[in-house]
C-alpha cells in the first residue's frame, strides 16, 4: 500500500508543482458575469509552500530563481513520497531547509503523507510584501504582555471550563480570512449583482459581503469574523472588514483592527489575493500579504470537527481526573 501511495505522491507532485508568474498577463481577458464584473466564482485552493515571513536564507531576495525552485521541487518530491507525517502550513518549507520531517504529534501519531494536498511552488520568497523585508512589523509591548499572560493562564487553567479552550478546538471558528495553506485551505466564491459570498473549507465559515453602498453595522456590534463591505476598483474586488469581537483573537484591542482584502483574477487558473491588516493592538505598523490562489475543479466537501462535541467532553473529564489524582496525592502526603 505504501508503495502505491509513494508512487501516487510523486505523480501528484509532478503534475501539480509549478511556479506561477507574478502579475497579470497583458493578453489575458478576464471572464465577466452578466453584470459586467470580473467573474471570480469557483473553487480556489491555497496550497502554496510560500512562507508567511521570508526565511533569512533568502536575504532581501523578493522572488525565487529557477535554481531555488529546482531545490524546493526536489525537497517537496522527497517529502510527498516519504510516507511520513503529513506536513501542513509552513511545515513543508521548514522540512526542506532543515532536511528532516518533524512529527506534528509524536505522542499519538498524525496523518501520513498520503493525506497531503499537492503543494504548489510560487515565485515569491514570502507572502509578506510590506514591510519590504518580508517580515511582520514588531509586536507591540501590549501584545507581548498579553501573550505571556494568556500562556500563564492556560498553564494554570488548561480546562477549568470549555471557555479555557480556543475557538478552533471548540469547533466554533478558525478565523476569517483563514490563510493557512495545505489543510482545509480551499475557498469557494459565489457572486450576485450586489453580494459576494466567500466560503472557507475550514469549518465552512461563510462571509456574505454586500457590494452596495451600505454603512458598517454600529460600532457596538462586534462579530467573530467582523463586518465586511465590498466594492469594485476596476477589475479588483476590495473588501473592508471592521467590528471584530475581542473574543475572535487573543491579541489586545482587536476591536480596532481593520482588514482590507483585494482579489484580482490574473489568469484562467490564478487569483491574486492581497491582504492588508491594520491591527494597532498587535503590531506596530500595518502589513500586507500576497497569495496566489489556484483554480481547481475539485469540490469542497463536508467539514467535520468532533461531532457531538465528544472531544470537549473528554478534555474536561480528563482534567477533572487529573485534579482528583492530584488531590489524592496531596492527601496521602
Model-derived segments and spans:
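Positively charged n-region of N-terminal signal peptides that target proteins for export
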Residues: 1-7
Amino acid at each position: 500500500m505504501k508503495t502505491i501511495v509513494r508512487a501516487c505522491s510523486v505523480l501528484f507532485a509532478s503534475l501539480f508543482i509549478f511556479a506561477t508568474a507574478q502579475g497579470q498577463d497583458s493578453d489575458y481577458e478576464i471572464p465577466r458575469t452578466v453584470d459586467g464584473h470580473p467573474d471570480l466564482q469557483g473553487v480556489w485552493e491555497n496550497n502554496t509552500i510560500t512562507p508567511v515571513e521570508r526565511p533569512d536564507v533568502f536575504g532581501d531576495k523578493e522572488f525565487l530563481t529557477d535554481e531555488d525552485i529546482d531545490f524546493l521541487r526536489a525537497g517537496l518530491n522527497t517529502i510527498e513520497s516519504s510516507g511520513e507525517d503529513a506536513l501542513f502550513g509552513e511545515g513543508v518549507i521548514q522540512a526542506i531547509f532543515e532536511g528532516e520531517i518533524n512529527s506534528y504529534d509524536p505522542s499519538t501519531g498524525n496523518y501520513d503523507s498520503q493525506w497531503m494536498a499537492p503543494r504548489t511552488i510560487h515565485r515569491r520568497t514570502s507572502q509578506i510584501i510590506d514591510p519590504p523585508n518580508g517580515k511582520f512589523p514588531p509586536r507591540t509591548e501590549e501584545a507581548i504582555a498579553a501573550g505571556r499572560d494568556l500562556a500563564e493562564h492556560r498553564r494554570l487553567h488548561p480546562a477549568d471550563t470549555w471557555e479555557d479552550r480556543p475557538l478552533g478546538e471548540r469547533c466554533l471558528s478558525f478565523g476569517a480570512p483563514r490563510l493557512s495553506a495545505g489543510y482545509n485551505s480551499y475557498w469557494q466564491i459565489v457572486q450576485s449583482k450586489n453580494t459576494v459570498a466567500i466560503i472557507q473549507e475550514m469549518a465552512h465559515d461563510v462571509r456574505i459581503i454586500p457590494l452596495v453602498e451600505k454603512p458598517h453595522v454600529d460600532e457596538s456590534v462586534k462579530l467573530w469574523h467582523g463586518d465586511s463591505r465590498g466594492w469594485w476598483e476596476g477589475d479588483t474586488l476590495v473588501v473592508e472588514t471592521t467590528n471584530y469581537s475581542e473574543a475572535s483573537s487573543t491579541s489586545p484591542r482587536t476591536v480596532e483592527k481593520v482588514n482590507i482584502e483585494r482579489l484580482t483574477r490574473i489568469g484562467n487558473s490564478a487569483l491574486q489575493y492581497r491582504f492588508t491588516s491594520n491591527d494597532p493592538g498587535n503590531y506596530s505598523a500595518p502589513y500586507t500579504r500576497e497569495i496566489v490562489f489556484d483554480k481547481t475543479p475539485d469540490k469542497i466537501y463536508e467539514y467535520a470537527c468532533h461531532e457531538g462535541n465528544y472531544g470537549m467532553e473528554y478534555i474536561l473529564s480528563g482534567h477533572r481526573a487529573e485534579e482528583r489524582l492530584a488531590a489524592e496525592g496531596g492527601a496521602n502526603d
